[in-house]
């Protein structure tokens, strides 16, 4: 009903476009074109009241043109630019925008994706990354109702693919495409506090953007699909994950509880990770 929809808030999308330095080989424009075309046809976008497209790096005019032209200037889309964001911040500016949105809209449900692989131009990595992106988009975008149901009706706080539970390091959704609620986001630290850590760890500990979603002390997670595949090395083909029925014969996702005792220091060896 309308009252129930108002009580749940809106569905809002966040899309991070990370543009590498101009002297770095990249096919980011191809990635943006492919992802925007898929977004616009997806269940996730049809459910959304708005989509925030946040661009980090140079060439904002090119990114803006691609998004505007492909969407035919859809008023649902808002464009943002972080021109001076250093490369080590990666997705943090867009996640901060998501965090700020939730401060004003605590009932909203969110989905998030980014230009995974934009800095990996050379084969075979660029080829395997394209397959990885497509796999994540299949669940998070094309069949977005699965995660939307898990968040809005299933009692889950986060929903995604390939949950990685590292005792020493951190827990995260591999690839960092996900759905979540503003109620969960409001329990996390502001992403901007990760900037000094990201700068210090740029070449050692990987991408802090992936770890942020799991920095609440406890939550319930829904994992739609998992594989032990090495996405950087091996292509994950559609026949390995697509459901011929479009998930019409599958029950809705369920959650498992998760807890962490050192949410603000996920690099600490005292972290025990998450588990059912």
Where are these regions (language model features)?
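ER/Golgi luminal nucleotide-sugar-dependent glycosyltransferases, focusing on the catalytic module
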Residues: 1-276
